[in-house]
Amino acid sequence: MKNWQHKFFVGLLCCTFLFFGWENQVLAAGITNYSTPIFPSQLAQLQVPQNVYDYLQQYQPETYNYLTEKLAASIEDAKEPLPDEVVNDLWALSPNNPRIKWRENNGKLEYLMSTWKYVSNPSTDWPIGAKKLLPYQTWFTAVPQVKEFCQQYQAVDSNNIPDHIELLLRLQQYLGLILNKYSTKTHFVEMWVKEEDLMRPCIDGEINDSSCNLLPVPVPDTNPVVKTIYTNSYTNAKKEYYPWSGLGYTYDWGNPEKPHQGPSEFIINPTPEKPVEVEVVSVTPTQEYCQNNVEQ
């Protein structure tokens, strides 16, 4: 980890990380000119918010403005997916994939999936071992893709921002989430999800391959799920848009390298009338989930 001592904060995006657990990526662009230094003596006296949005608004407004501009550019870029952004290394959900976890339960294949959520009461909201009915669309990644990423992530050694805030920001970028006051996520919830209930949110929704076809824009009516996701990403009443390209991976707007590939993404698409049953495996606070506890 680099020691910047008392220089200006060089950027929430300026970090060395291992992408998909394979190899080092280049350093992201710094944002030195947009940060206000906060020294340890000051930071110790502050009531630091646990939400990235609140922290940046209160203590780093110029950095927040820079990041919102970067996010806006990412949204425009993702809106029109290009052929060279199609990848062939998506994580496949298949017993033949050694990277994922699966089981056969009552004659049906199930995969261990993870979702990042706000959880106010883990023991009652997501009791471990319980079967839970989900009546709403939920986005997942396959365990352990995000866990590997965040355990390998190293925060910038800076006096200007708490490490836990920086980690939360990097996860929001990696998962293609935006900066707003409602974006607080507290826990990673892992659960067994039936194969038959999962799909990729792309024009060809198969989960057992490693690529998605290029998303046609406008999205055809023949794929109403994907069309709704695309519409909600770029036109909604709140005018809070998301960088989503429908190519099977999240748009990582913290990664400067095209195609800005984040983890492979999957969804379930139940309704209140027809919920999806899952089995809760673990509910882990974000900081704990991302600790790299190397076994001796």
Positions of predicted regions on the chain:
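Solvent-exposed loop/turn segments at secondary-structure junctions
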Residues: Y118, Q145-E148, E196-M199
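Conserved NAD+-utilizing ADP-ribose enzyme module
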Residues: Q172-Q296
